[in-house]
Design a protein with these regions (language model features):
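N-terminal beta-strand motif that seeds the catalytic metal site of vicinal oxygen chelate
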Residues: 1-25, 86-95, 144-145
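Vicinal oxygen chelate
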Residues: 2-8, 52-53, 93, 99-145
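Short Gly/charged-rich anion-binding patches and loops
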Residues: 25-26, 100
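Conserved active-site tyrosine of GNAT-family acetyltransferases
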Residues: 26-31, 54, 105
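Short secondary-structure junctions
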Residues: 35-43, 110-117
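Conserved short beta-strand elements that form part of the metal-binding/catalytic scaffold
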Residues: 37-82, 122-145
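Charged surface patches that recognize polyanionic ligands
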Residues: 70-77, 83-90, 95, 105
């Protein structure tokens, strides 16, 4: 194992993101069908997205399901829905230090979407690995607030 490999420390799966056209209908569907509980909702004005975090099972602290709906037609989620339709949009991992993890991944030749981490849901700091460098999967790195 190289030094760069040793520096990447993924702590757990944080959430799986699903793009939806209607956030309220999707929350209702996942609650009624699978018994998931909505534990957080917010609108990210910078990204143009409405989002909800749904808890899976009795442990609200475990991995979550994130529902993402466009808040405006020019958002990345709106473009994703236009291109691919509703469905899986991202896989997110919890990391201790998003900057250090990003630097280690860049050292391996992977591209990140942002030069510097950005603030996101509930004050977390995030960055994304470009899907073309991660087998077609948009990988999100989440450093909790």
């Amino acid at each position: 194992m190289t030094d760069a490999l040793a520096q990447v420390e993924l702590l757990r799966i944080d959430h799986v993101g699903i793009a939806v056209a209607d956030l309220d209908k999707a929350i209702e569907f996942y609650a009624a069908t699978f018994g998931l509980r909505c534990v957080h909702q917010e609108t990210n004005e910078e990204q143009g997205v409405r989002e909800a975090m749904l808890a899976v099972g009795p442990d609200a602290g475990g991995p979550r399901l994130q529902l993402l709906a466009p808040a405006r037609p020019d958002s990345a989620i709106a473009k994703f829905l236009d291109r691919s339709g509703p469905g899986l949009q991202q896989l997110a991992y919890t990391v201790r230090d998003v900057e250090a993890t990003g630097a280690a991944l860049r050292a391996r030749g992977l591209r990140l979407l942002y030069d510097q981490p950005r603030r996101d849901t509930a004050g977390s700091r995030i960055n994304f690995v470009h899907p073309k460098d991660a087998g077609g999967v948009l990988v999100e790195l989440v450093e909790p607030a």
